[in-house]
Amino acid sequence: MALWRSSDNMVYLPPPSVAKVVNTDDYVTRTGIYYYAGTSRLLTVGHPYFKVPMSGGRKQDIPKVSAYQYRVFRISLPDPNKFSLPESTLYNPDTQRLVWACVGVEIGRGQPLGVGLSGHPLYNRLDDTENSPFSSNKNPKDSRDNVSVDYKQTQLCIIGCVPAIGEHWAKGKSCKPSNVQPGDCPPLELVNTPIQDGDMIDTGYGAMDFSTLQETKSEVPLDICQSVCKYPDYLQMSADVYGDSMFFCLRREQLFARHFWNRGGMVGDTIPTELYIKGTDIRDSPSSYVYAPSPSGSMVSSDSQLFNKPYWLHKAQGHNNGICWHNQLFLTVVDTTRSTNFTLSTTTESAVPNIYDPNKFKEYIRHVEEYDLQFIFQLCTITLSTDVMSYIHTMNPAILDDWNFGVAPPPSASLVDTYRYLQSAAITCQKDAPAPTKKDPYDGLNFWNVNLKEKFSSELDQFPLGRKFLLQAGVRRRPTIGPRKRPATATTASTSKHKRKRVSK
């Protein structure tokens, strides 16, 4: 009896087509017009470990300013479509729009190189596990100590037209909350959030939410024990479809472990008995195996500096090749090589005592930072064809709204009520409803706002970064003062008459 059976050969179907993301160079035309823009000296001063609230006669808080915080600058640029251009025939406002492209940047850092310390007066350290003479698991109940460390050394620069994305580990949710008992290890969850100005960086203790995952408040130094340390999510930003969050990045990290300790407290996960052989006396039961090193960033040197030098953007890592959508730029900076903390001392008496008494002096600590930002922007045009506008609308409809393009609503078929006496008290108030204000998409996020709308200049040779740009571009500047050589006039060969020779007879 013959039976039918399906073929063993597998048939592979082609994958479904996906919408193609094009590079900005495919629909953005670059012009030969460049502008320089730069900030004044940017300074910030504060307490390196925590925010000091108002007290006594002080009417303002002292902010937390640490070298281990992200500095995120939100840079506002002028609208090029309302810009005074040198050539009126540069573009057609009916069919084109102008945008800025960032082609050069230099991040200036002031202040000398230095190493700043952080620590905790009640740091959770039990034993020196590198060379411990004995186990102290049966020693005092509180083994915390005053410890200071020098954090991991980090230099970082991320530039894009949207904020950079950070990642950290936070306390997750259990599938069965009713089964969670006090003292159980919480589940972990990877969280992605925008990096804001003032967020703490990874200092060598990991990117995590210490306020919810370390309830002893003594596992890490003071400045991060109740904070969230974020690490840039390079994987997500590199895989960004449109490449807006990271045109390019510069980073340098350095770390080694200086001391090796274990943590005090009850060990939550017991060591399996098959992993060791029991001892006697103080070795009857193992001590805490929850080991934790103290990080160190080691030596700082001017040979490994990423700042105070120009960078030119020729090709971005993503599809956005430096186009500043919404006329703004986000610059994320970290520099721990200038982390010196100032220690200040003042006397509590009217005059400085002649004999030192520590009870007559107060000690304070402060941290200062200094920045100088310079940019080179290139003017670009976009021809508003149907395909380009459709693509931009799919990418970000707010861009077309900024260009005064919008979708016209369909005509209304319903009747509209119109009253005769608008000022009459017999009818409802006829005041027009206020126009809805445009909401900032980054409302509620903290950035260092920098306004460059009135600081653009086309005289590149008048600024340090502009001269460097002209040098690398191979452009020779023309002299503006002093004597100029006149162009040589073309000389025509004069026709000389042949003289007759006298012949002697």
Swiss-Prot record:
- Give the location in the cell: Virion; Host nucleus
- Keyword Disulfide bond (UniProt): yes
Gene Ontology molecular function, alphabetical: structural molecule activity
Name a single GO biological process: endocytosis involved in viral entry into host cell
Biased composition, class Basic residues, residue ranges: 496-505
Q: Which Gene3D superfamilies match?
A: Major capsid L1 (late) superfamily, Papillomavirus
Indicate where this protein is primarily found: virion
Map out region (Disordered) in residue numbers: 126-146, 480-505
Q: Report if keyword Disulfide bond is assigned.
A: yes
The record describes the protein's role as:
Forms an icosahedral capsid with a T=7 symmetry and a 50 nm diameter. The capsid is composed of 72 pentamers linked to each other by disulfide bonds and associated with L2 proteins. Binds to heparan sulfate proteoglycans on cell surface of basal layer keratinocytes to provide initial virion attachment. This binding mediates a conformational change in the virus capsid that facilitates efficient infection. The virion enters the host cell via endocytosis. During virus trafficking, L1 protein dissociates from the viral DNA and the genomic DNA is released to the host nucleus.
The similarity annotation says:
Belongs to the papillomaviridae L1 protein family.
Q: What is this protein called?
A: Major capsid protein L1
- Which species is listed as the source? Human papillomavirus type ME180
